[in-house]
């Protein structure tokens, strides 16, 4: 899968190539592509499988879906670091810390553009259409979070809407895209979507709790 991604994200420009290499090597554990591959295996029919690189239960369409969601996520993180003025990402310098925010914004846009281009070049329009709408949802979540960042009146419903749009929506799409990639029945696609949404909400709530505990633990009385 890593080679599949790298083969589609390269640049002849020296600076863009450096930024891409750094960003792609700073990616996390790949939760979203793992969800795509898991749900494709759960919903695929035995006679509807074309193996890629010897990997069981993984068709070229599934690889494409996994790549699309992972790189949309990667682009969103690059932009997140610019918005948050974050100097690090997973223990390494962020793109904006190394190459300034203006270049990092362009990098995020470049990754997003190459992701969409890869999807269209594949001619798998049902997959692209299924996944690409999540970009707008993520953007809405980012604006909502910014709107409520210093709002002491933020409600539980506000919080749930923010984490759904920023995090759970793409994990939900990842889960349903796995089913779409193997041409699963609509009922299976919907079940996987609901599973992904629940997983994404739980994932972000747990992450926020851990962040809060970390902040509380760092407070010292003087």
Can you say where each PLM-predicted feature lies in the sequence?
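Conserved small/polar residues in nucleotide/adenosyl-binding loops
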Residues: 217-222
């Amino acid at each position: 899968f890593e080679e599949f991604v790298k083969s589609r994200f390269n640049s002849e420009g020296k600076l863009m190539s450096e930024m891409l290499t750094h960003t792609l090597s700073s990616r996390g554990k790949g939760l979203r592509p793992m969800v795509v591959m898991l749900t494709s295996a759960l919903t695929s029919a035995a006679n509807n499988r074309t193996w890629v690189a010897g990997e069981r239960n993984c068709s070229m369409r599934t690889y494409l879906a996994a790549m699309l969601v992972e790189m949309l996520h990667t682009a969103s993180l690059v932009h997140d670091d610019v918005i948050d003025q974050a100097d690090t990402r997973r223990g390494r310098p962020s793109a904006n810390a190394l190459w300034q925010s203006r270049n990092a914004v362009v990098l995020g846009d470049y990754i997003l553009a190459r992701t969409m281009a890869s999807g269209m070049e594949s001619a798998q329009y049902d997959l692209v259409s299924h996944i690409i709408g999540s970009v707008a949802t993520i953007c809405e979540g980012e604006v909502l979070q910014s709107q409520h960042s210093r709002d002491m009146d933020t409600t539980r419903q506000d919080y749930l809407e923010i984490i759904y749009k920023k995090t759970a929506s793409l994990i939900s799409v990842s889960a349903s895209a796995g089913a779409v990639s193997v041409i699963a029945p609509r009922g299976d696609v919907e079940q996987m979507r609901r599973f992904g949404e629940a997983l994404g909400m739980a994932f972000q709530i747990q992450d926020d709790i851990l962040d809060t505990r970390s902040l509380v633990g760092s407070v010292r009385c003087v």
